């Protein structure tokens, strides 16, 4: 099977900061890839390059046989991008916003209306279809963002902390939705800090630190002969300790008897 996404020698530098350092990766159709790493590791930069948001980089990226640098607009048609609470036109209603998004992908009005209604209903938002989104909670806006990223039935779905602000029922639904999309042959690139979710839903886990891939495999392969959780593996590969020492040091800041403002 040919990979649907091929990344070769990908590098990106911001001034003197190396965000990505010569990473290479193959992603195959029907896979859920968990892409994890500490803050500043290069996760968001990778996502923005794949989505065509950042176009100034070194290396080669091919998506569905299309060179990203040569035809970024064609690649964007194949990708559904679901970020963590990006800027929205929140003076619009969900109906207006999703119609706008659908038009960007040249969908017919009837298709937009049908898909929007069904997806909003699944999230319990159909009664709010004509309500301005500036009155929505964080979770409600995130649900609309998820719908907007899937409205055009993309071949590849890229999610960057998609569960932010969602209620428990919506989280369960999204996790089930990922499995449905996978069964349909879609490729899921899931970027998150939520280790327990990544561990449960991913076929492969790619761990990035300091702009470099430090682990790439199934959870079983990453565990090797241990039974450590993904959280423990993450800590072992990206930190000098398991967090216990740092947590104790943090807590000692307010236990210091000489600290000004201490409450008796």
Can you annotate each of these PLM segments?
Residues 216-217:
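ABC ATPase "signature
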Residues 59-70, 74-75:
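Conserved ABC transporter NBD signature motif
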């Amino acid at each position: 099977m040919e990979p649907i996404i091929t990344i070769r020698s990908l590098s990106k530098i911001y001034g003197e900061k190396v965000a990505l350092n010569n990473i290479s990766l193959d992603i195959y159709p029907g896979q859920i890839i968990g892409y994890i790493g500490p803050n500043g590791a290069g996760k968001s930069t990778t996502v923005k390059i794949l989505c065509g948001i950042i176009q100034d980089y070194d290396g080669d990226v091919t998506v569905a046989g299309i060179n990203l640098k040569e035809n970024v607009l064609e690649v964007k048609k194949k990708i559904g991008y679901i970020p963590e609470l990006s800027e929205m036109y929140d003076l619009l209603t969900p109906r207006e916003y999703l119609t706008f998004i659908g038009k960007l992908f040249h969908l017919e009005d009837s298709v937009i209306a049908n898909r929007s209604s069904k997806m909003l209903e699944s999230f319990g938002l159909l009664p709010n279809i004509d309500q301005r989104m500036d009155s929505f909670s964080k979770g409600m806006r995130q649900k609309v963002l998820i719908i907007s990223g899937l409205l055009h039935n993309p071949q590849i779905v890229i999610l960057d902390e998609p569960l932010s602000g969602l209620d428990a029922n919506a989280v369960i639904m999204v996790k089930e939705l990922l499995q449905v999309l996978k069964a349909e042959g879609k490729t899921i690139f899931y970027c998150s800090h939520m280790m327990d979710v990544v561990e449960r839903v991913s076929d492969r886990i790619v761990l990035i630190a300091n702009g470099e891939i430090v682990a790439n495999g199934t959870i079983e392969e990453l565990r090797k002969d241990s039974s450590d959780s993904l959280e423990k593996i993450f800590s072992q590969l990206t930190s000098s300790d398991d967090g216990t020492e740092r947590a104790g040091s943090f807590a000692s800041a307010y236990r210091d008897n000489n600290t000004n403002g201490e409450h008796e």
